[in-house]
Every structure is written in C-alpha cells, then in structure tokens.
C-alpha cells in the first residue's frame, strides 16, 4: 500500500476563513487543502481531501478507506484505501458515536485535529468521542495544526512502513 493519508473535514469547516475568524482564523479550507497537498508531496505522501456537512457521508468515506461501504463494489480497486486518517470532525467530535464506530471499525491510525483549543471553549466542546481511539490529538494551533498533523502522519507512516 502506498503512503496515502485521508484528510477529512466535517460540518462547517467549509466556512473556515469566513466563520468566526476570531476563533478559527482567516485561512480558508481551500488554502489548507492546497498547503496540505504541497506539504504531503514534499514528504513523499499522497493525500486525499474530503469535506462534508453530513455525518453519513463522513462515515461512508471512512468505510471506503478499508474497501467497505455502500459505494464500494467487490470489483473496485483499492484506490480509496489509506494508511492514515487526519480528521477534523468539527461538531461531530462531541456528538457522533457513528464516526467513532467507523474509525474503530476500519482500524486505520488517525489523528484528531481541531483548529481552536476546544478545552478553552464551551464545556461541551471538551468531550470528544474520538480522542481515546486516536494515535494523536492536535488542538489550538490554528491552521498550522493541519501541517503538524501531516508531518506527524508522514513520520508515523514511515516508521510503520519500514
């Protein structure tokens, strides 16, 4: 399997750069994805990006990483399979057992990511359904958190792959 990472962004992250810039900054998701592709290329890693405001679509995409899911046929090539997942699940972090279960089912190492420091915000944001299953959690680093997650994933994959 090639060193491929899937970057998932959940609900409202398509509004980065517009929504509450005093919390989330002015960098857009498009900017983040462009930077992610460039950085991944420099690190010798392929990266796929996916954003959805819909929980089921995110669950489907996670399942596809293992060759499963409603949109995968037995004749499909494993083109959507990955070695690691970086996920900013947005509000689904605090509510979605379905996303947690999908990540646990595929058993692919994942990094949980948040642009803001969720522990310095409303109390409900401090609880994550994902953290105890993640190999790493990054929060409060703004858009730079994506770069840190990609670097970590690339190094983790290199260690695992050698």
From Swiss-Prot:
Biological process (GO), any one: 3,4-dihydroxybenzoate biosynthetic process
Q: Which EC main class describes this enzyme?
A: lyase
Keyword annotations of the record:
Lyase, Quinate metabolism
Endpoints of the signal sequence? none
Pathway recorded for this protein: Aromatic compound metabolism; 3,4-dihydroxybenzoate biosynthesis; 3,4-dihydroxybenzoate from 3-dehydroquinate: step 1/2
Q: Which EC number(s) does the record attach to this protein?
A: 4.2.1.10
InterPro entries under this entry? DHquinase_II, DHquinase_II_CS, DHquinase_II_sf
- Which reaction equation describes what this protein catalyses? 3-dehydroquinate = 3-dehydroshikimate + H2O
UniProt cross-references to Gene3D superfamilies, sorted A to Z: Dehydroquinase, class II (3.40.50.9100)
Picking any one GO molecular function of the record gives: 3-dehydroquinate dehydratase activity
The UniProt annotation places substrate binding at 88, 94, 101, 115-116, 125
Q: Which domain of life is it from?
A: Eukaryota
A matching Pfam family = DHquinase_II
Report the record's disulfide bonds: none
- Active-site annotation: 24, 114
Q: What is the purpose of this protein?
A: Is involved in the catabolism of quinate. Allows the utilization of quinate as carbon source via the beta-ketoadipate pathway.
Q: How does it assemble?
A: Homododecamer. Adopts a ring-like structure, composed of an arrangement of two hexameric rings stacked on top of one another.
State what protein this is by name. Catabolic 3-dehydroquinase
